[in-house]
Amino acid sequence: MVSAAPAARIRGNNPNPKGTCTVTERTLVLVKPDGVQRQLAGRIIARFEERGLKIVGLKLVRVDRGLAERHYAVHKGKPFFEQLVAFITSSPLVAMVLEGPNAIGMVRTMVGATKPTEAAPGTIRGDLAVEMGQNLVHASDARETALTEIGIWFRPDELVAYEREIDRWVIGPQAE
């Protein structure tokens, strides 16, 4: 079944077969203009899908100044704010919402350190990025941030809840 879903869809604690608990979360990921221009969007998206994360929202966006300022509002007044806005408005980007067990932490680990020179090999930034100002990807850093950012980039009707047969093989049976 496919339906529109709210940005805040979190299933709570779900026991997995090993007896530990996972939390199904949603998180925002942006493939920034450098990732789009370098034609890495598909490779980056594939890494998340290969890990078992589910795409529930995806679009190519030409970012205007207003959207950039809303996204970077926490940095308003900082010396690098204008540089952030200029970069994110310089070319289209890919915005997506990913869903999965502990998605926020998993995505942050997969993305790697903000400074590509400090990012571990095997991470997106460690493998593909060179310069901090052009580090390919933005990923929400906490649940509250994810909820806010998803609301900035996506309307509720742009997010689609659906079940995948593969979920039982990726995350196991889920207690509702």
Report each predicted region and the residues it spans.
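Non-catalytic terminal and connector segments of soluble metabolic enzymes
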Residues: 2-6, 10-176
